[in-house]
Amino acid sequence: LPAPKNLVVSRVTEDSARLSWTAPNAAFDSFGIAYYEYVSYGEAIVLTVPGSERSYDLTGLKPGTEYFVYIQGVKGGIPSEPLSAIFTT
């Protein structure tokens, strides 16, 4: 499956950030999002959002920390290629 497109990280504060992306309507049943502290390769936090969503707010982040985040679309239990970004709070 092709990955979702145009992953943008916006509204970054000391402890939160908004993710937004694009994908064709009904292309995916859900999206899997994973993120972790980039430098320390901390344990990834993994979550799932409905396939109708095109944004998600990450909360509870650490100030002054670089994060790696990626998103995959899921259709019929099969994940797409990942789309990733790096951002700093």
Show where each model-derived region lies:
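Extracellular low-complexity, O-glycosylation-prone stalks/linkers
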Residues: 1-59, 66-89
